[in-house]
Amino acid sequence: MMEEKPLHESLSTAQRVFLTFSLMVGVFMAILDTTIVDIIVPKMMAPLSTDLYGVQWVITAYMTAAATAIMLVEWLETKVGLKKVFIAGLFLFTTSSFFAGNAQSLEWMITARVVQGFGESLIVVSAEAMLFSAYAPEKRGLAMGIYGLGVSFAPALGPTLGGWIAEHIDWRWVFYINIPIGILNFLGAMFFLPDYKPKHTFRLNFVSFFFLSVATVSLLIVLSKGQQLGWFSSELIGYLTFLSIGSFLLFALSELLSKNRLIDYSIFRIKEFVVAFWVYCFVLGFSMYQVFYLLPLYFERLKGLTTFQAGLHILPLALTIGLFSPVAGAISDKKSSLIPLVIASALYLYSVFFILSDFNYYTPALKSAFLLVPLGIGMGFFFAPITNLALKNLGTKTTLGVSLMHYIRFVGGSFGTALATNDLQKFMAESYDRMVEIQNYQRAWSFLEILTEWGGLTEEKAKYYLQSIQSLYALSDSFERTFFNAGYWALLGVIPILYLLYQSKKSLKPSMNERA
């Protein structure tokens, strides 16, 4: 029986290659949807008979469903095995893609996206757990490098692909394109993926799961809608915040009183997992998600590029991530996960503090695109080693570890996106007000006179033109400050990496003294 020995010992080379390919196609397709849909949101409004605020629920629904479903995967794994969980995820994701593409109303689209988000969770968690188990311990860094290629390359590629589809075909094909890929992958996985059911039992605590789900959904809606509704000046935001905090407290109480806990908290006694969990939350969620959110906005709103052009300018970032992710995985196997993590931290912090924080209106768009290469190298060196570090000592807790890492990715990423949105608006308002305060009114009136007398504009149009220029400069300054602020969260996130580096050097000293 295959369950009697580790999965990696049961696979031939051909089986392992197919398993890797099948899992990565599924992961790439699912994670690509997290950013590719962001690009087409404005184009959905008229066909779905809604406004910008209404159509944003298309993104919020997907995110909340995915985050909620994540904690079910470990239970499903013990019931049916990872292969069936992966296949079920493909079925849900592909089927809901068809209904999303055919959506004629906002309610229809939101329902399809909820199912799609649920399917995405089943795909990414089962695929990562199975891929990690399919490789021998000395090659798991490479496996996570391949997985990291999908996790990081897909969202970076989303704006380019989404922009091209929206401009040259139709926005509905963003969903339809998943159907043939999903069907082929579904059939291949059904017939050729090995059955794999880890040897441990798990009983789902439905009470804890309910409270955690309510808390998570409430929190994510607060973070995604807070800026739009005016944060705590809104009764809805206040109510949802209270509901989220209360549900988290009830979840904690349920876990304390129950003998059958939703989460095996002994996982947090494993030092490497705790470090990776912290880094994933702050570096990936709070910081990198800000960068992923801000870059398309920078090229479109400040540089005036079309959606597709903006995607092309982000493409060097995506390609660099894809190129260096397997390299980082190989280094993790041969040396240590700490080496590529230190490289990733240094390059990412340098890029955010000294490159992105200088992106403004006057930075040539093409120059900005090529300046994203160091950032791409840093991100490429990040995903494989941090995942390998998190999972290498978990044993039967691997699926739980994967689930928790993806859960904190969703929650941290929602915080990061909310921070970027809030900071961008706040800094823009501050810059605009400061600009008005120090404005030389005599020169401003002279400029208006030139526009009216020599430019042939009416006084109202001339004033509007001047305000537009001031707003553009304020937005330019806001992008610089928001990018810079994103770096502080990454700085907080890398502190445990420095601790592990210190510990590893400390442990090397006695061994060197013994040899001497």
Residues covered by each model-derived region:
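Transmembrane-helix signature of multi-pass solute transporters
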Residues: 92-102, 181-188, 246-250, 323, ...
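Short, Lys/Arg-rich, polar N-terminal cytosolic tail immediately upstream
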Residues: 1-11
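Hydrophobic transmembrane architecture of multi-pass small-molecule transporters
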Residues: 408-502, 507-516
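Signature of the 12-TM Major Facilitator Superfamily
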Residues: 21, 57, 69, 84-91, ...
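12-transmembrane solute porter fold
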Residues: 17-32, 37-41, 48, 52-53, ...
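Helix-loop-helix hairpins in multi-pass membrane proteins, especially solute transporters
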Residues: 70-207
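Hydrophobic transmembrane-helix bundles of small-molecule transporters
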Residues: 167-280, 287, 313, 483
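Structural signature of transmembrane alpha-helices in multi-pass secondary transporters
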Residues: 30, 62, 66, 93, ...
